């Protein structure tokens, strides 16, 4: 038993050392990438290291590929969101349907987002894109320090052909992991990751739904 315990402790120590070394390598690459992108685009100075790291991880820590992708993102952002953010007055036809809600945090500290697909109506594609950016910015502003993910509950009840104009929406939200579950097990499935106090009341939880524009 003592040999087994010593073996387990040794493995845990080795894992900790490897994790520390990996973090040091990642942090070093974040610093290198920051210097490169700031030299190309001074506006990169306004972005925190978590954002830089996110792009690095998306390109398997390849600094060149991550830098190119990040600079492309900055150029897009400057063109599509010239004022730095999307205002509610720019997306009135999307907000009126109350289809996206911001809740509390799940058990892992991730913000909870609820999307009602059946409330989506075909509309101007450019306004839809602005709405997606508005939504993602709202979500990011609610993320605790160090958190990089959020949970999304995609409720497709009532969704049909008239709601199918969602290609741009789904593309922008492709980072989401969508899990389809049977209605009879929906609440228990959600409670695996969300405390009842944070679960939306629409799913027999205790927290009222909060429209994205009021979050």
Please identify what each model-predicted range represents.
Residues 1-215:
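Basic, amphipathic alpha-helical/coil surface patches used to engage anionic, phosphate-bearing ligands
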């Amino acid at each position: 038993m003592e040999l087994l315990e010593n073996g387990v402790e040794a493995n845990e120590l080795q894992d900790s050392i490897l994790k520390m070394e990996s973090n040091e390598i990642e942090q070093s690459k974040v610093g290198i990438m920051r210097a490169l992108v700031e030299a190309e685009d001074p506006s990169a100075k306004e972005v925190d290291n978590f954002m830089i790291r996110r792009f690095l991880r998306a390109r398997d820590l390849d600094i060149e590929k991550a830098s190119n992708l990040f600079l492309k993102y900055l150029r897009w952002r400057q063109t599509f969101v010239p004022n730095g953010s999307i205002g509610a007055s720019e997306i009135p036809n999307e907000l009126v349907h109350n289809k996206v809600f911001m809740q509390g945090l799940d058990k892992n500290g991730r913000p909870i987002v609820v999307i009602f697909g059946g409330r989506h109506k075909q509309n101007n594609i450019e306004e839809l894109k602005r709405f997606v950016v508005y939504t993602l910015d709202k979500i990011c502003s609610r993320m605790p320090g160090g958190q990089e993910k959020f949970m999304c509950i995609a409720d497709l009840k009532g969704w049909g052909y008239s709601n199918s104009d969602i290609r741009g929406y789904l593309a922008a939200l492709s980072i989401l992991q969508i899990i389809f579950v049977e209605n009879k097990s929906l609440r228990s499935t959600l409670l695996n990751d969300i405390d009842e106090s944070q679960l939306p009341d629409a799913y027999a939880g205790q927290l009222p739904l909060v429209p994205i524009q009021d979050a």
